[in-house]
């Protein structure tokens, strides 16, 4: 697998922002605040109880391992459509107010199947309904194959998560299976089904055509 830090940032298509890959080795100015913001994002989603199977909020150390052990891509706004991607080592970014969203990329299986990745997506609670999730999804299709993954599997897309289902199917993800009674979600009686989605990344040569 390729070092995520060597992959060029991806410019968002719908607003002025860049998606940048980071991991535990990335030099980020005020990285602790970035981690704190990511921790807030995931714990907010856990508390909502609608999209992640996790039901216990993460500590700072758990979140650090969750986000930085392999790779997380962060979405950072810039002033204009001609602004370059910020240098994370030197840029003074107020992560609490500026971080638009993020997603992790990691192997979905060990060993002989580690070329198949999984991703989890988070949009800032204060920046929702602005198309950020759609841009994160497209950034995922950019970064994952460049890291070296051949395909992606999402293990649990709950049947109640209509926006997510529409997004992945619009991007030609294949519904590979259904898990009956997969989750106990807040606001729903009984159990909710979940879908498994898979996507085969085109070769980088084909993607650049």
From Swiss-Prot:
Summary of pH dependence: Optimum pH is 8.5-9 for azetidine-2-carboxylate.
Location of the protein in the cell: Cytoplasm; Mitochondrion
One MF term in the entry's GO annotations: azetidine-2-carboxylic acid acetyltransferase activity
Coarse class of the protein's main subcellular location: cytoplasm
Keywords recorded for this protein, A-Z: Acyltransferase, Cytoplasm, Mitochondrion, Transferase
GO CC, alphabetical: cytosol; mitochondrion; nucleus
Enzyme class per UniProt: transferase
Keyword Cell membrane included in the entry's annotation: no
PANTHER family, sorted: ACETYLTRANSFERASE, GNAT FAMILY, N-ACETYLTRANSFERASE ACA1
Function: N-acetyltransferase involved in oxidative stress resistance. Acetylates the toxic proline metabolism intermediate (S)-1-pyrroline-5-carboxylate (P5C), or more likely its spontaneously forming tautomer glutamate-5-semialdehyde (GSA) into N-acetyl-GSA for arginine synthesis in the mitochondria. P5C has been shown to increase the levels of reactive oxygen species (ROS) in the cell by inhibiting the function of the respiratory chain in the mitochondria. The enzyme is able to reduce intracellular ROS levels under P5C-induced oxidative stress and protects cells from damage by oxidative stress.
Protein name: N-acetyltransferase aca1
Organism of this sequence: Schizosaccharomyces pombe (strain 972 / ATCC 24843)
Classification of source organism: Eukaryota, Fungi, Dikarya, Ascomycota, Taphrinomycotina
Gene: aca1
